[in-house]
Amino acid sequence: MKLLAAEDFIDNTSDAELSPSVIKIMSGALDAIAARGIRRLSMSDIIDASGVSRGTLYRYFSSKEEVLAAVSEYVCTGFENGIREAGHGIADPIERFKAVMIFYARYTNENSPDRVFEVEPRFHLEFFRSHFDRFNRAVKHALRPVFDHLDQLVGEAINRDAFAETLVRTQLSTLLVPASDEWQRLWNDTAENVEKWAHKFALVQPREAGKD
């Protein structure tokens, strides 16, 4: 089943995206997908899982497809807003980097329940494929001061697009193989390790240049 694009429904729900009822519907829909899968999912399942009345559900969404599109947008927007807020107001670039990395790992764990991926892998795959560029942009934007700092350390511009995409692809891999405690520790230590690498690179460059 192909999900509707967000613009196919957003005009009908933009005024209520943050209302308690819509949030309950989104959360309930995710639970229902995990329990039933998309093909078997019905509007009644969403009503039961979210605890809203039939009238409330149909006030915002006229079909299951609209709910699924809204769920995709809800999860993606939540990531974009959350990763931006994670680093907001943190002046130290490495501390900002740490905060962003910790948020990203937590968000993946809390918003991509294993049961959904097991029951409905197609939903996950289509979601991440259609929102992949937005995830990359959100990470790159959140780490902009970090990239500025690293550019200064190494004396040249790093590839920001590749850096951000590597982080996104790495975090997505944990949906297939859950992260161990050791891997999680390495992920959380990425900021400090990258800074150490940048310092070492900066020290080596002048010596290498002197050999030429």
List the predicted regions and their residue ranges.
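Hydrophobic/aromatic residues within well-ordered alpha-helical segments
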Residues: K64, V71, V75, F79, ...
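Short hydrophobic/aromatic patch on the recognition helix
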Residues: S50-F61
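Hydrophobic/aromatic-rich alpha-helical bundle segments in the mid-to-C-terminal region
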Residues: L150-W197, R207-D212
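Short hydrophobic clusters on alpha-helical segments that form packing/core surfaces
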Residues: I25-I33, V75, F79, I83, ...
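Amphipathic alpha-helical packing segments from all-alpha helical-bundle domains
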Residues: L125-V154, D161-E165
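Hydrophobic alpha-helical connector segments
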Residues: A70, R84-S112, A164
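Basic, helix-initiating cap at the start of DNA-binding domains
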Residues: M1-A49, E66-A69, H88
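Amphipathic alpha-helical segments used for helix-helix packing
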Residues: T108-S130
